[in-house]
Amino acid sequence: MANTAPKVPLPERRDAPEVIDQQAAKLVNLINKSKHFIIFTGAGVSTSAGIPDFRGPEGAWTLRAQGRSRTTKAVSTLQAIPTPSHMALLELQNRGVLKYLVSQNCDGLHRRSGIRPEMISELHGNSNRECCRDCGKEYIRDFRAVATYEKTVRDHRTGRKCTRCGGVLHDSIINFGENLPEEALKLARDHAEEADLCLVLGSSLTVTPANEIPEVCGARRSSKLVICNLQKTPLNSQAHMHVYSEADALMTRVMARLGFPIPAFILKRRLVIKTGVDKNDRQVIALNGIDVDGTPVSYLRSVKLEYNRRVARSEPFTFNFRDALSPGTELKFELEFMGHYNEPNLVIDYQVQGDGAPEAVYDLHYDPNTGEWMTMRE
């Protein structure tokens, strides 16, 4: 992997709006004919969210090469709103048009936008994801789950332990010189081999071996490679078309021509409330966040039970009851979130389940534009 850039970055170029319109029409024609359409994203897909790229005029490696500091304010990846491009990809996934997504980005915005875990290879990791190397259990955090690297960049320990086996948790970030995750890379290559159309959004395609994924498509006559990037790339000669444009400018036109809406970003959380019995035969109620595939997600700061002075401030969020609660007993839990999107507290009405139904699952949807929660019980 390359962690450098020239002192003078490659010039950026922007096609005229009417040219982008024409190229969007051509791309839509390719998408409509495609049987296995994949997308490869780089930092340029997140720049409109306020997250800097690497090799643009204000890119991280460009600034390092020039020995100067950033002149524009960057947005925290935890507070960044997924861009129109992120949300367009979500809509394409949900409609079955997009078959697979490969990303070089560590910002976690694809997953936060709603891309399903089985639909994406995050080749360089995810700053919100950590895992146990002993048992393989993964965890998603609503905070930066990255090691300090105080001793060495090869030390990926985050300081937390696996709740399943007690093993040490490691971040998922791939630092320069490290191998890419085998399974994610294999899935990316498999889909690239099957793809008849690959769209690159916002990548300079200079970082190996990730750039080999779109190259697989560009090298085959049976597939077409389309690149959307403001700078030239090493794969331009293999590309069927290069759109010199921001990702959002192209994707908004593509979605309009496809007749698909670009959905607004909704922060989606899943909450599981379980009842059980502890070693002292006391009834226990536990609250936990999960992802769509059951992966634990840490997004709660605290949980408070109505008429109970105790506030649970760390995972697992549990409440013990000396006397057993009868089925049908109603409880109110007040959830406090991390608040990266200014989420207000939310009160969950829970009815104690009988022995046959010890678990209740809630879908919690938050709209950052209105500041309101919507709660649905499955």
For every predicted segment, state its role:
Residues 1-306, 312-314, 320, 325-330, ...:
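Conserved catalytic core of sirtuin-type NAD+-dependent deacylases
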